[in-house]
């Protein structure tokens, strides 16, 4: 079995590194070139085998910010050789006051650092290396970065170019290069063999009282070339010891913090899935920073991920999955920075063998070069599944809800935890528990044995807790900012499932979005298109209340384009828009008589009848269409008039778009179903409906599966009636919303947008739900809303990428034809108590029942627990982020690479790299011969 190697180039375009071209007319400055050579770690330039030119980052990265006088003084200091002011005065021959002024100015800019690490506790200045060192410091100085944005690209270059040839040969522990992953402390508390330097608490205690929160230089750097991740860069890096004073005193936007706040920052980082790293250039007794790193921007993590050389980052720990406990919820997968955890399966194949999963090769096993690099690592690491697939329920669900996970939690009676897990992927579980089309159940592996697990019924049972304010679950926000939230204003147009979902996920990310809804109540088609006997409005209102409690404002009775325009909202400071207005206008089939009095489009009929729970009907009703909307129209009609209700549709019964359950319920209520007929003409008398002529449909789809009906025009039937309700499609009602906007649309009126980001031709406008896809189900709109929120979060922060490092939410279903199910609970599928058919047919109230608690326990025991997470130990960097996301005690860190905790001084790196290179080369050579 192999992982996908060929990525969709449209979704995963080849990564292009940022470049900077210096002005060729600027005079070449030798002092700058000399200093660049002094500091660089690029071996050809260091040894003089290649001259430093104006096009080298070592040159242009310094030329824009330093004077020749500063460069001439700095080059005399030597790299990482601390000197006091007196020593530098003696060395340079400069007058003391002038010398100190130059040193302080270079410290302010970021070329120099300083500390008091000597017996006399005298201030001493240090010329650091580029990385970690002055490249970071330049990017931490906002004034420098504003005036010289090329410093962002300079940092990118100097954290990559010097490493290209040596990373395969770096031994465990990193040999004093760069940064070192330090695991989440809770993840290693039970490890008896752990050593002090593997614990963040050790370093916090060592530098007690000397901490400063400072900006992340990587996050700032990436913004300069359009690759920001939308995190607020401020405060994520904790300077310790004398470095705390340095970042506060030299305009690096640092601020002193106490230990309590340091711990809060670390916890916030873990909540966001950021990786703790410490500096690794001074041996085992010194660090100067604890960083909290997002793999989508971090150059330190890139050293292992780009070159596929985990020794550049990894801690002494490796994650392992307890398969028996794992339920393939996928949360560890979503957050793993290294892409080391992916979803697989527990079930054996037909031969009774466990699926064997591949491991990425290591440099010690084969020749290493650029062919083994992963330039697109930020995207590749977000691939969710092995090609052999995982749990079909999670795969089939458009929102990819962790079905297997919440079934297990419900089985254990952990109902709050189960609801919390659902709400990570679906903010409207109660709604879906009543109206979802249950693709998870269609895909359920248990269905190959007897009947699918009643997944939706379990979800309904759990979600009813939201109806009670005492048991309602309000999700915790996870905000990638230490300021408590974001001030950027975002407008959502439409309060249907897509708009509500988008608002929900934006709120969880720290925004306070505003929803504009033209109707009097929020909910969209959930409120105005679905009858109350299927979805009670108090249930919908309860879930909307949760969204309001998260800080979402919903303004009803406001039509965008009529009451206020998008341009006016822009003038009010709105930075991004999500248009989710649905397909709220019904279509008619284009036949004679379709506008006679007594004809209606189904969505218009449902809106009025559903709101009033009545409709003035007299005489027989014919409903044209075979989907769920048509059935809703027929069933509501039967509640509004004591007459014959007939349905006519093109499809044969087994091919009807409506669900089997909906069809069965309609038949139970006395609806007459006629399949294989299409409307030919509406008959009129005095402008009113008198009947409908239907013609025999002999084909619905063509050979390519496209809608292309054919008819036998000679075979017809005439149905007398007083009302005709057409459920033959829906259209988008834009109104005046798009006036003066250049928003491109399809020929059918739907919005054109990028298929990954949902961005339209108006860059600040994103779309989702039916307005983009055409009529689909609530769960499709919910899934789209989440993606819209991700795009808007990235968009409203300037210079952030909408695509890099984005989880494509692409899942693969395991092969149900190649599994063996050896033992399982043999109990039958649990069915909720059935409502009285006559009573249900006569009311708009929902008389259906949920499963009882006992039934839930029995039903959840039927799950075959198909999926599980799988860790590739060759990719794992031992950060422990996965352990913070698992609520099943299914993934833990184990100390298996003690050598990875051996920290070296940067000056000694070649002493450890060269012997390892020889040893490794010999090993690879003999391995090739075998």
Question: PLM ranges: what are they?
Answer:
Residues 462-484, 542-562, 586-641, 745-761:
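Glycine-rich dinucleotide-binding loop and its adjacent helix/turn
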Residues 595-620, 682, 702-775:
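FAD-site-proximal beta/loop scaffold in flavoenzymes
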């Amino acid at each position: 079995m192999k992982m996908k190697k060929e990525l969709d180039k449209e979704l995963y375009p080849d990564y292009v590194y940022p470049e900077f071209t210096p002005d060729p007319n600027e005079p070449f400055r030798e002092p700058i070139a000399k200093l660049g050579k002094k500091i660089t770690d690029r071996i050809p330039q260091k040894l003089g085998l290649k001259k430093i030119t104006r096009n080298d980052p070592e040159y242009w990265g310094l030329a824009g910010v330093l004077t020749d006088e500063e460069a001439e003084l700095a080059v005399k200091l030597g790299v990482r050789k601390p000197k006091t002011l007196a020593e530098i005065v003696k060395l340079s021959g400069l007058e003391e006051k002038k010398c100190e002024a130059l040193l302080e100015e270079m410290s302010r800019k970021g070329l120099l650092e300083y500390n008091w690490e000597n017996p006399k506790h005298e201030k001493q200045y240090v010329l650091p290396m580029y990385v970690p060192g002055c490249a970071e410091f330049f990017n931490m100085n906002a004034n420098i970065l504003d005036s010289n944005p090329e410093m962002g690209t300079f940092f990118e270059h100097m954290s990559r170019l010097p490493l290209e040839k040596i990373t395969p040969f770096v031994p465990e522990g990193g040999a004093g290069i760069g940064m070192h992953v330090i695991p989440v402390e809770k993840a290693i508390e039970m490890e008896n063999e752990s050593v002090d330097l593997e614990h963040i608490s050790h370093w916090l205690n060592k530098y007690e009282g000397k901490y400063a929160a400072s900006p992340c230089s990587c996050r700032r750097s990436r913004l300069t070339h359009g690759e920001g991740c939308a995190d607020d860069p401020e405060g994520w890096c904790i300077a310790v010891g004398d470095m705390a004073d340095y970042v506060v005193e030299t305009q690096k936007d640092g601020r002193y913090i106490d230990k309590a706040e340091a711990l809060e920052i670390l916890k916030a980082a873990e909540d966001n899935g950021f990786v703790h790293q410490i500096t690794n250039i001074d041996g085992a007794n010194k660090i100067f920073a604890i960083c909290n790193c997002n793999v989508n921007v971090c150059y330190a993590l890139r050293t292992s991920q780009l070159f596929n050389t985990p020794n550049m980052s990894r801690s002494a720990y490796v994650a392992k999955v307890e398969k028996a406990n794992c339920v393939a919820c996928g949360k560890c997968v979503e957050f793993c920075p290294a892409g080391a955890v992916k979803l697989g399966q527990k079930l054996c194949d037909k031969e009774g063998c466990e699926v064997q999963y591949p491991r990425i090769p290591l440099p010690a096993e084969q020749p290493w070069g650029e062919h083994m690099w992963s330039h697109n690592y930020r995207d590749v690491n977000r691939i969710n599944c092995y090609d052999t697939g995982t749990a079909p329920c999670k795969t089939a669900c458009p929102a990819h809800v962790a079905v297997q996970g919440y079934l297990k939690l419900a089985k254990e009676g952990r109902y709050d935890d189960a609801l919390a897990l659902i709400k990570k992927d679906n903010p409207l579980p109660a709604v879906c528990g009543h109206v979802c089309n249950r693709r998870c159940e269609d895909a359920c592996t248990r269905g190959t044995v007897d009947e699918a697990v009643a997944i939706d019924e379990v979800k309904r049972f759990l979600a009813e807790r939201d109806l009670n304010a005492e048991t309602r679950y309000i999700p915790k926000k996870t905000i990638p900012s230490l300021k408590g939230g974001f001030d950027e204003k975002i407008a959502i147009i439409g309060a249907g499932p897509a708009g509500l979902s988008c608002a929900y996920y934006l709120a969880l990310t720290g925004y306070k979005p505003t929803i504009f809804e033209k109707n009097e109540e929020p909910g969209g088609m959930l409120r105005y298109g679905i009858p109350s006997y299927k979805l009670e409005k108090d249930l919908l209102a309860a879930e909307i209340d949760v969204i309001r409690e998260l800080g979402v404002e919903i303004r009803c009775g406001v039509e965008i384009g009529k009451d206020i325009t998008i341009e006016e909202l822009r003038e009010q400071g709105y930075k991004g828009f999500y248009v989710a207005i649905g397909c709220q206008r019904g279509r008619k089939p284009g036949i004679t008589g379709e506008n006679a009095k007594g004809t209606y489009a189904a969505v218009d009929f449902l809106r009025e009848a559903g709101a009033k729970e009545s409709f003035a009907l007299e005489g027989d009703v014919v409903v044209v269409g075979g989907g769920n909307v048509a059935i809703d129209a027929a069933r509501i009609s039967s509640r509004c008039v004591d007459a014959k209700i007939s349905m006519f549709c093109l499809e044969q019964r087994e091919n009807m778009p409506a669900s089997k359950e909906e069809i069965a319920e309609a038949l139970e209520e006395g609806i007459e179903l006629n399949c294989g007929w299409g409307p030919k003409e509406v008959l009129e008398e005095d402008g009113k409906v008198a009947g409908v002529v239907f013609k025999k449909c002999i084909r619905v789809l063509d050979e390519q599966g496209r809608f292309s009906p054919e008819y036998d025009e000679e075979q017809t039937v005439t149905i007398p009636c007083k009302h005709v309700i057409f459920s033959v499609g829906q259209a988008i009602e834009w109104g005046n919303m798009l006036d003066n906007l250049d928003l491109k649309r399809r020929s059918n009126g739907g919005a054109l947008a990028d298929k990954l980001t949902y961005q339209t031709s108006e860059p600040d406008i994103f779309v989702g739900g039916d307005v983009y896809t055409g009529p689909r189900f609530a769960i499709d709109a919910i899934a789209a809303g989440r993606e819209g929120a991700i795009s808007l979060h990235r968009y409203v922060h300037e210079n952030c990428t909408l695509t890099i490092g984005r989880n494509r939410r692409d899942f693969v279903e395991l092969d149900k034809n190649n599994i063996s199910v050896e033992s399982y609970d043999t109990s039958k599928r649990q069915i909720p108590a059935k409502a009285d058919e006559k009573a249900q047919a006569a009311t708009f109230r929902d008389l259906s029942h949920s499963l009882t608690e006992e039934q839930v326990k029995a039903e959840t025991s039927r799950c075959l627990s198909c999926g599980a997470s799988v860790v590739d130990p060759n990719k794992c960097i031992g950060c422990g982020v996965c352990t913070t996301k698992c609520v099943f005690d299914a993934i833990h860190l184990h100390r298996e690479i003690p050598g990875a905790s051996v920290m070296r001084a940067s000056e000694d790196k070649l002493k450890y790299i060269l012997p390892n290179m020889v040893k490794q080369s010999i090993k690879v050579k003999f391995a090739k011969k075998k």
